[in-house]
Amino acid sequence: SESYLTAELDDGVVFQGFPDVGDRLLGVIGIQDKVDVFLIRHAYVRTLARRQGIGGQLLDHVTQDIDKPFLVGTWKAAIWAISFYEKHGFKDVGQQETERLLKTYWSIPTRQIETSVVLADDRWRAR
């Protein structure tokens, strides 16, 4: 919704889009600077444009010139999302670290923490 998008923008989430030939977006990614890390808060590709490398291009675009680590949180059941991030070098940080990171960088209910996973890029593991 427009109000949710406005709240995300007000919270510092910056969006990048992948346009089609016209003005229509095929994909979008939103990242948030949390001082010592960046969070991938949103990543979506239109159904008709999936499996064409758009998500990977968006991910590469937003991560390439930033030295800070990137973290992404998602549902444990979102196997497709976990597979996508693993394909692009992200790794599961484990349950204890997931809980700590979700409490530190995200504002989500306890139940969501229990059913989520955090994946981190190489910069996180190199710290």
Regions found by a protein language model. Give the residues of each.
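A short, internal acetyl-CoA/4′-phosphopantetheine-binding micro-motif in the GNAT/acyltransferase core
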Residues: P19, A43-R50, T74-K76
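Conserved beta-strand in the GNAT
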Residues: V13, G17, R24-D33, V37-Y44
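Short glycine/proline-centered loop/turn elements that form peptide/ligand docking sites
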Residues: G55, L59, A77-A81, E97-Y105
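Active-site rim helix/loop that mediates acceptor-substrate recognition in acyltransferases
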Residues: S1-F15
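Conserved acetyl-CoA-binding loop-helix of GNAT-fold acetyltransferases
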Residues: V45, R51-Q64, K87
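Conserved catalytic-core motifs of GNAT/GCN5-like acyltransferases
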Residues: L71-T74, K91-T110
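Conserved GNAT acetyl-CoA-binding A-motif
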Residues: Q64-A77
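Short hydrophobic/aromatic beta-strand or adjacent loop that forms the aromatic wall/cage
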Residues: V13, Q112-L119
